[in-house]
């Protein structure tokens, strides 16, 4: 409530002015904008008592009267000037409310008081008078507590060894930030979390040891590396037995990364890392699983998938997406990357082993266009070559001797053959008379015709027997005129189930579906 004495006086800018000479435009004494009334001053902070309300105005029994007449008193003049003569402190003696809040009679009593911004000098004075309990810097303690909680959680889960826990967090946090070597050592002692939110582990390639920090991994490596072959880093506890590994590690310390990607800003220390990075710019997934739809760009990821689920790898693709049958995936091997398949020697390859070789290379066959191809072109060509040599030798043995040539002689095998049923040869006539020589030539030509016809009948009968016995598939009831085609066809039949494809593992119900499968599906 405004007192009756306020009829002729009002508060403006902390001083009393009469309303007789009221001006329309009232300029505040403050150098700030027009909406900020009252001189700038430091607002004191006081503890909230039970007898105080939310507005900050206390009862008249505790403090001086809040009437305008009391504002002109000497005590209030002194209390108003006290913030300028004495430094402001926390929990100091209370002041008059309307001086503290720059009370303006033109504003409602219950409204929020407007406080003008503080000048640079006043802010500096306030900073000097603040007690240390205002906002202490607890960042090192927070980091230290965080590391302690991480150690305790790791020790409870059994992932943190006792050797690592001996190096306390106090030891790590007490190191200087200017010392790069100590900072690196601190980062090596603290476990890291991967992108999946799990603690990153380091597995030993020679035993079952698993470490959660680089420092533990390097200390364990001393067990597998002899002392005369150990190569250590002069700046950190890194240890290896390979010179190029130490060279790459020292490049990381020096910040030297000579290999740079031509498509982005990526840089690395060796060519292998750059090749692995370049796969991220490619859309070809070279490695895939045969048993499911899993595909990846990295060979190591496929090996992990195959070991985890027991699946088999599919054909590896090259950088352009074409199949590479010479590249195989060694699932349980320790060597990084795929392996190049070694080709068997020609003399070691046998026709009997052809159906059981699980090879992917194909060779088109012009006689049977419905076949996508036949496995192992090298062995197939070798088999055809050997068969041609065998057929050529038998043709030379069965060739009829030309008796008109004087240098030829009979062999024991040729003497026992038939000479023809109704002809008799007199050698004396051949040597004495020219006419008889022509007659004998005609006679022997007849003998040659008889022998060729007899041999043809024998070969036809033998071929028919082979078709019925040797070159006939008992599962599909198909007779093959060539041993090569028969061998290739039998290679598609499974060992336990004849209607299971030996190349891809597809099970068919009967011989018709099996024949259609091997005829239509390209086994690449």
Swiss-Prot record:
Residues 59-75 have a biased composition (Low complexity). It comes from the Eukaryota. Residues 42-86, 101-187, 402-442 are annotated as: Disordered. GO terms for molecular function: DNA binding; zinc ion binding. It is found in: Nucleus. GO terms for cellular component: nucleus. Its main location: nucleus. Keywords: Developmental protein, DNA-binding, Gap protein, Metal-binding, Nucleus, Repeat, Zinc, Zinc-finger. Pfam families: zf-C2H2. InterPro entries: Zinc_finger/UBP_domain (IPR050688), Znf_C2H2_sf (IPR036236), Znf_C2H2_type (IPR013087). Residues 76-86 have a biased composition (Polar residues). Residues 118-127, 138-154, 164-178 have a biased composition (Basic and acidic residues). One of its GO terms (biological process) is segmentation. A zinc finger (C2H2-type) spans 202-224, 231-253, 259-281, 298-311, 471-493, 499-523. Belongs to the hunchback C2H2-type zinc-finger protein family. Gap class segmentation protein that controls development of head structures. This is Protein hunchback.
